[in-house]
From Swiss-Prot:
It is found in: Secreted. Has antibacterial activity against Gram-positive bacterium P.citreus. GO terms for cellular component: extracellular region. Disulfide bonds: none annotated. This is Oncorhyncin-1. Skin. Keywords: Antibiotic, Antimicrobial, Secreted. It comes from Oncorhynchus mykiss. GO terms for biological process: defense response to bacterium. It comes from the Eukaryota.
């Protein structure tokens, strides 16, 4: 759950 949220945050910041 935490990893998934962090992954989404990272992807959003990268995008």
């Amino acid at each position: 759950s935490k990893g998934k949220k962090a992954n989404k945050d990272v992807e959003l910041a990268r995008g």
